[in-house]
Amino acid sequence: MFGPYSGGGGVPLPQMDADTYVRTIAAMPPHPLAPPPDSPRTPHTYVGFLPVFGDLPPLTGAVLQEPVPVPPEQRADQPVAVATENSAPTRPQLCAPYDDEVEATLRAMETNPAERPSPYFLETTQGGRMSALVRASMIAFMGEFSRKNKLADGTLQRAAYFLDRYLSVTPESDDALQLRLVGATAVFLAAKYEDQYTLRKIDASMVAARCGYTSETRHKMVSIMETEMLAALGFNLGGPTAYTFVEHFTRYYGDGEEEKQLKEAAHRVADGTLLTYGFHRYLPSMVAASSIFLARLHELGHEPWSNDLAELTGYKAIDLMGCVCDIYSQIACPRFALLQGKNKRVCKSTSMQGMNMMA
């Protein structure tokens, strides 16, 4: 854990300590012994896309005999499912292998040291030349740049991921123009990764102009920085972010208004963590699960966690305590514009403070 962000304003909320946290998760109503048929682990959205083949009768010459209808409970060729009190919810057999492969791949990638930022890159690689507030101002600039150009969802999360990895291996100067170039290039690179049609919205020349470059060859500055960043990242761009895991954990959500609000709120919580130096030390899946926890607590007012969510995410409520408490400690800061609107992920106070330091 780490202390509250020191650069924000506002009156801090009381810390959510272990006792408060445990009381919160224990205040849930008891869970039923058997999961409902529309469990989050049941990929009902896949059913319409999977071919269903009935029992084909044998062919004798050119004669096709009609099968005799048999009640479902008397079908001898169907396995009998025996439900017990301890039965775990299961996915349809046709979907399970694919779903499990995706899960295993994401978990392996997020724990790969080669694709993770250094835990203390500001203190080590940057040698104290860059403060947590300057980094936060870079994220604020990147968020504004991403929103103004209406870049793909998930771009800011991936751009921040690229930035932290780049700063983990590349010492940077404190030149404001250079810092803007680094941040904007990270957004440009992330946007192209997330959406193949990004170049229809922005190009290298527009990116350079947004940073403050005015020469006719300004696009070359972005191209050079992009090459340097790709080399620093080892050309490994596909690591999962908290956005990836929020999408993964809510993949069975329907089109209901409540589910949409929960998903959007979880994304806003996860985006808010980008501004605070230190959250990169948590695994993206834990940040995503903690964001869903707080979004449910805010939207539903009760039952922030359940057995189905524990199975889906791989985290019990008690496992999330540290991350949830760290996020909760930031909510009082004005710069952590939590759950206040779809596009209000970065507050103006942090942006203005950071821009003054970068100017």
UniProtKB/Swiss-Prot annotation:
Belongs to the cyclin family. Cyclin F subfamily. One of its GO terms (cellular component) is cytoplasm. This is Putative cyclin-F1-2. Keywords: Cell cycle, Cell division, Cyclin. One of its GO terms (biological process) is cell division. The keyword RNA-binding does not apply. The keyword Signal does not apply. It comes from the Eukaryota. One of its GO terms (molecular function) is cyclin-dependent protein serine/threonine kinase regulator activity.
